[in-house]
Amino acid sequence: MRCSAISPGSGTIINAISTGKGSAFGIDLKIKANVELKNDGKSKINGILLDNPSLKPNLVERCVKNVLEHFEVDYSAKISTSSELPLKSGLSSSSAASNAAVLATFGALGEKIDSELILDLAIKSSFEEQLTITGAYDDATASYFGGITVCNNLERKILKKDVFKEELDVIILMPNFKKNLNVKRMKLISDYVELAFEKCMNADYYKALFLNGILYSSALNFPSYISVDALEAGAVTAGLSGTGPSYIALSYQENTEKVKNAFKKYGTVIISKPDNFGSKIIY
């Protein structure tokens, strides 16, 4: 009983920590999970992160465990993951890993694909591993379905789905900044994040992303001028992704190299595309 699945990461349009409502979009950088099950009655689960074998695979092991417990089977399992996403960077690597792990386990069991249940089990696993504050329903759904999702994270409801109407590149900056999770400061800006969220509900995603980035970078002591540098170089929008430290910019292809050059003085730059396809079983 084997299966492999892939899930893309996501970029932030609105970070949900401040208000409980958020939005994200799929990015074409994926995590692949390979699951092999054995009907031996031992319930032994072993995982490995192939790109970072020294790191503990607790999240993906937890995902497999929760799926097997849900279906009340005592199989043993092996799970391995490989990733195009940098870890702990604000690009939803945890959501992508949990989605891929849960989906691959469903596939290995031969169970019917139930999107709501898959998302619930993936988010449950992230909560149990203390990797999320709000449940990250916006990140999880953008990774699972692809495209743009706008969500009430607290109620686990998708308020709207969309895609970018234009052909865009995603330019990702990974600066050497220390991550900062000051929830109290993020809550202080909730009234202003609400204004950015209204832009998002009105499909003004570029303005929403930029405003959100300025607000959260200020609250978390990341430089906001990096986003302005990207705009100056021709990006249609730019901002902090998640709680950082990564920044994302969206650009038409003719300006991508200029935006990349504006970003690269601050750290490593990756060029990607929006992902509108989401998670899927590949074999």
Swiss-Prot record:
Pathway where this protein functions: Metabolic intermediate biosynthesis; chorismate biosynthesis; chorismate from D-erythrose 4-phosphate and phosphoenolpyruvate: step 5/7
Q: Which reaction does it catalyse?
A: shikimate + ATP = 3-phosphoshikimate + ADP + H(+)
Where does the UniProt annotation place the signal sequence?
A: none
Q: What is its main location?
A: cytoplasm
Query: Can you tell which superkingdom this protein's organism belongs to?
Result: Archaea
Q: Which HAMAP family match?
A: Shik_kinase_arch (MF_00370)
The entry's keywords: Amino-acid biosynthesis, Aromatic amino acid biosynthesis, ATP-binding, Cytoplasm, Kinase, Nucleotide-binding, Transferase
**Which family does this protein fall into?**
Belongs to the GHMP kinase family. Archaeal shikimate kinase subfamily.
Protein's recorded name: Shikimate kinase
Q: Which residues bind ATP?
A: 86-96
Question: Which PANTHER family does the annotation name?
Answer: HOMOSERINE/4-DIPHOSPHOCYTIDYL-2-C-METHYL-D-ERYTHRITOL KINASE, SHIKIMATE KINASE
One Pfam family this chain carries?
A: GHMP_kinases_N
**Subcellular location(s) of the protein:** Cytoplasm
NCBIfam families (UniProt xref): Shik_kin_archae
Which GO BP terms, alphabetically? amino acid biosynthetic process; aromatic amino acid family biosynthetic process; chorismate biosynthetic process
Which E.C. number(s) belong to this protein? Answer: 2.7.1.71
This protein's GO cellular component annotations are: cytoplasm
**GO MF annotation terms:** ATP binding; shikimate kinase activity
Q: Which InterPro entries match?
A: GHMP_kinase_C_sf, GHMP_kinase_N_dom, Ribosomal_Su5_D2-typ_SF, Ribsml_uS5_D2-typ_fold_subgr, SK_arc
